[in-house]
């Protein structure tokens, strides 16, 4: 899980989801997981 000020998709399988007011990137590749904060 990477914590970043801005999140963006790394590959085609990445999806951006807003959960409890926090933007997150969910992907099959664990390395691509991100959250904004």
UniProtKB/Swiss-Prot annotation:
Pfam families for this protein: Ribosomal_L36
One GO MF term: structural constituent of ribosome
GO biological process: translation
Signal peptide: none
Protein keywords: Ribonucleoprotein, Ribosomal protein
NCBIfam families membership: rpmJ_bact
Record family assignment: Belongs to the bacterial ribosomal protein bL36 family.
Name under which the protein is recorded: Large ribosomal subunit protein bL36
Species whose genome carries this gene: Mycoplasmopsis synoviae (strain 53) (Mycoplasma synoviae)
């Amino acid at each position: 899980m990477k914590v970043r000020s801005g999140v963006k998709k790394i590959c085609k399988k990445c999806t951006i989801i807003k959960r409890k007011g926090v933007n997150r990137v969910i992907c099959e590749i664990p390395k691509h997981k991100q959250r904004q904060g």
